[in-house]
Amino acid sequence: MGFRHKDIIALKDLTKEEITLLLDTADSLSEINRRDIKKVPTLRGKTVINLFYEASTRTRTSFEIAAKRLSADAVNITASTSSVVKGETLSDTANNLLAMKPDIIVMRHAVSGAHEYLAKRVSCSVINAGDGAHEHPSQGLLDMLTMRQKFGKLDGLKVAIIGDITHSRVARSDIYGLTTMGSHVFLAGPPTMMPVGIERLGNVTVCKDMREAVDKADVVMMLRIQLERQGKTLLPSMREYSRYFGLNPEVLGLAKKNAIVMHPGPINRGVELASSVADCDQSAILAQVENGVAVRMAMLYHVCGGEPVE
């Protein structure tokens, strides 16, 4: 089966077969990242523009590395050093970039839906690197790849996602992707950070407290508080948040013995995650970062029309 989409905007738009194809391709391409010479000519002659309106370390760097390992030319643009600071609109930015004939625009934007707006106005492919509190599809894919590598499957897994669900685009992509693949997602967080009706997104259970969500979980995914997306104070204090929704060794002990701990980063140590847990043998956080390069290679490959990789 080939990949039928010009763009990758949201995991909500992808079928189980399409997600499996992307994960299988990422698994195959991950071998390149372990070579002495980490480069193949697959996308030679292609141009990838990384257009970031928000700060990023892991996502932007790994998209750039992914493009270069496939021999594409990667150009990085940040809003703070572009004509955006002079008042240029997204539409005008897109038209000017399109005039330079790129093959793919990878964009991160603070406004939910910005990528759909962009994709309708450009002929090249668009990949969503995060839009507001909507979705972060590459993070969702790399999270699923990390889980699949550990457990050999996604179907039937119990995945606990803890934290600021309302403002987290990672939570939404994980929920869409995992429920499509047959996992059961359990959510916990402060009531002020739990969107009403989120259980309607799929096989999702909203728990009254963190311990209920973590109990017998295969995966414990911790999320940071998205202070930059909150218009008002939603917590009495970080100390109180950590007391009720921070993952420490005692709470982790409620999960299955072979459970893994995950976090999309950046970590706020001592708030949502104790350092002793972040650095323990069950932590898969750095495996997530490593898998991010392979997943983004797969995304670039398939929007350029790549065939399934054996």
From Swiss-Prot:
Annotated positions binding L-aspartate: K86, R169, R224
UniProt key word rRNA-binding: no
Catalytic activity: carbamoyl phosphate + L-aspartate = N-carbamoyl-L-aspartate + phosphate + H(+)
Protein name: Aspartate carbamoyltransferase catalytic subunit
Keywords tagged on the record: Pyrimidine biosynthesis, Transferase
Organism ancestry: Bacteria, Pseudomonadati, Thermodesulfobacteriota, Desulfuromonadia, Geobacterales
Species: Geobacter sp. (strain M21)
Pathway: Pyrimidine metabolism; UMP biosynthesis via de novo pathway; (S)-dihydroorotate from bicarbonate: step 2/3
Gene Ontology annotations for the cellular component aspect, listed alphabetically: cytosol
Subunit structure: Heterododecamer (2C3:3R2) of six catalytic PyrB chains organized as two trimers (C3), and six regulatory PyrI chains organized as three dimers (R2).
InterPro entries in the cross-refs: Asp/Orn_carbamoyltranf_P-bd, Asp/Orn_carbamoylTrfase, Asp/Orn_carbamoylTrfase_sf, Asp_carbamoyltransf, Asp_carbamoyltransf_Asp/Orn-bd
